[in-house]
Amino acid sequence: MNYTQFREAAYRHLVSCKQLLNDAKDSTTKKDAKDRLCLEIYYLSGYILESMLSYAVCSSMNVNGDVNQSKPFKEDRTRFKVHNLNQKYNYALQNGCNGLRNICFFQKKHQDNLVQNLFDDWRVEYRYENRSNLSPEILSKYISSIEGIYQTILKKYTR
């Protein structure tokens, strides 16, 4: 796997979230379907951030070739290959990703507390849970912020 595949995965997840969001906003979508779509959007959103943080780390460490043979995967596996976004962010900062210091959600909190809470609460297990606080409106703000992070990382770490 080449490190650019992290960027490609993030892009695919972002496109999927936007399409699912359009479907969830559709007035003809039934409530049960809307709830499932919102949960799927929320679940995928974390993988956009996770993939882009991995991309930034690999880019800043000049990883070339197979990522599985690189330092983050071989030597720091338990700190790099995690689903905890704050742990991954801290690992990125410790490994030269200083351009991430002021991105939304981590050190610079989002101005909308509901949007910030979505980020703070994200974890893989939510795929299997019911979240009553998810709505297309709040997820639209959340995905828009994540897209901003995606663009920022893309600009700072594409070599």
Q: For each predicted feature, which ranges?
A:
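Terminal alpha-helical segments
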Residues: 1-159
